[in-house]
Amino acid sequence: MSACPIDHKALQNMGCPVSANAAAFDPFTGPYQVDPAASLRWSRDEEPVFYSPELGYWVVTRYEDVKSVFRDNILFSPSIALEKITPVSEEATATLAKYDYAMARTMVNEDEPAHMPRRRALMDPFTPKELVHHEPMVRRLTREYVDRFIDTGRADLVDEMLWEVPLTVALHFLGVPEEDMDELRSYSIAHTVNTWGRPAVEEQVAVAEAVGKFWQYAGTVLEKMRKDPSGHGWMPFGIRVQQEQPDVVTDSYLHSMMMAGIVAAHETTANASANAFRLLLENRRVWEEICADPSLIPNAVEECLRHSGSVAAWRRLVTDDTTIGGIDIPKGSKLLIVTSSANHDERHFDNADDFDIRRENSSDHLTFGYGSHQCMGKNLARMEMQIFLEEFTKRIPHMELVPDQEFTYLPNTSFRGPDHVLVQWDPAKNPERADPSILDARQPVKIGEPSKTNISRTVTVDAVTPVADGVVRVTLSDPSGKPLPKWTPGSHIDVELGDLSRQYSLCSDPNDLSHYEIAVLEEPESRGGSRYVHRTLQAGHTLKMRGPRNHFKLDPDAQRYVFVAGGIGITPVIAMADHAKATGKDYEIHYCGRDVATMALLDRLTADHGDKVEIHSSAAGNRLDIPALLATPVDGTQIYSCGPERLLTALEEATAHWPEDSLHVEHFTSNLATLDPANEHAFEVELRDSGLTIQVAADQTVLDALRASNIDIQSDCEEGLCGSCEAPVLDGEVDHRDMVLTKTERAQNKSMMTCCSRACGKKISLAL
């Protein structure tokens, strides 16, 4: 069924629909083994779904196409995920039979309806609240292994640590008795070669022998656990669940999962860690950044997983005629969905080949898969990688790759990591020799997808300049003089001010990235942010900054703009007005304030925009007549406003007769209050892509419930202001409480902000 659907004999070579690149594709040799993503750049650009005669598979390479395959585990069956990609010899098959090898269904390759009941039954040990208990063990092992070579000045990170520690963690997580760990360690790699590799005929019997022994010994250890399943670990937990749900968790399933679990929890993390260290040390500036600021480690891990993850591809079986990326795929076809290629798709990741640890959507990577077959152990892997990086950046920040080493990889289609990573350093420069107390410092481990609050950069305060009564302009730049990130009118940044985080709109020139400017009003009722800026912040100080991000975007297709700013709301508006002028658009600006002395940026505004500006001062008695201004709708006109709530409310009332979505506003603050269980109700959230239904308590946000259930989702402000936690809605009416969506978007009911919005009824369904 997986044969090429093209009659090559009839077509000969001329005109054959299989392109030269597709015909030449061989995942076992050459470019794919060196760099899978780079080797398939031609496919992402020209032929995102192609048939490989060499492999007998359809190959899928773009992000959205790969994700759509993951999303539908009925149409695209995972049943062949563990099928041997290369047929084995009769001798190897006989060798496996000698050991009663019966590796069958696991979490990875099981179809519905059996898969999800088992996944739900066995999920609990993987949730964040349970994984916390493993952190001390991971830290202890990491410290012990680094201690062994810290004073030697040279190490092979793979042989001396990264292969061993994840395996030991995996065995502890599974609950394997200490006395059986060494034996199981010796068998693990054979499973990878047996399933995803192309061993030579003469190697197949030896590989099969090792796999058979692995299977047999795993069964022996499992039987030992059955005699006393009261201990900690996933396998004792599974045995206890089996006693309650014997039809869901069967004997054969536990045996298969015992073996598969060791490999899954071990090799993927070991390879991902080796890839990460190579990538970071090859990008020295980035390595030095995380050494200086370990709070960047969680997102550095995500970017490493995206850029150079350990899982290159998965396989699926097509159960019905379908179309992927505009290409008709017949029933029975086999798919190779190349996640490493998807992770480098420019259509989803800007400048996808760049290694950017501040990339805000790094955690969209598909290295852990997606949906109902997403890796259950993803957060254990994240924990290990974060702790590894923390230990090395703290203890051996001066470590470097040994020059001119050749990186080799175990040839296979799906899993990759260097066989060796050789590093060297001068032990005399080890920081702990001068200051042993650094060994006591600990960076918090982020269990789960990193929040955008973890993605910060250090900026220097160049100046704090008064620009109106009670308003200062703060000028920020990169300490090393590098350009700051690009931004567009309406963008804001998040600035950490002491223990607080506050959002401020950018009001400088987007074309001048040597610095940013924000303007801050001192608020008498401030929770501390503006007070800190006005009373503490000085030139020469450094701050942590995140962003820029833009949830207040200017519509480039509008024919005309009306800008209305109230007080400090001028900051995003002035950047928008500058852009309108630069692009030759028709526009007018209405700037409202209590008194001209309190109106920031007034001189620049009038100098740059002249008669386009109208000043409305309460003290001067010329308040803006909003109903008169907006009495007559004008085709092609878009209204943008930032200011106090009373201004925004008045504008909303005055534009009720305008075309929908003519008015765009940005709020200063959120009006969200703490959830009051007496006034809220519990409800269900169906996660259609993951095949799960979770409960949201009356005093719990959807965001909190998602994270407690091991579902990755971003967030930042968690006040309904920034839009980071948006999730697609498939069914059910949403009680929208955010300040992000427009009236039309709310009415369409296609998305919700999970940090604040809730279900109107008993259930909603999300595309997560």
Q: Whereabouts are the PLM-identified features?
A:
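Local cysteine-cluster metal-coordination motifs and their immediate loop/turn environment
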Residues: 572, 707, 711-735, 746-761
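FNR/FR-type flavoprotein reductase catalytic core
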Residues: 531-689, 695-698
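Cytochrome P450
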Residues: 1-444
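Short Fe-S-cluster ligation motifs
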Residues: 410, 418, 738-768
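Ferredoxin-reductase
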Residues: 446-542, 559, 593-595, 606
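Short flanking/linker segments adjacent to small metal-binding domains or redox-active Cys/His motifs
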Residues: 166, 428, 621, 697, ...
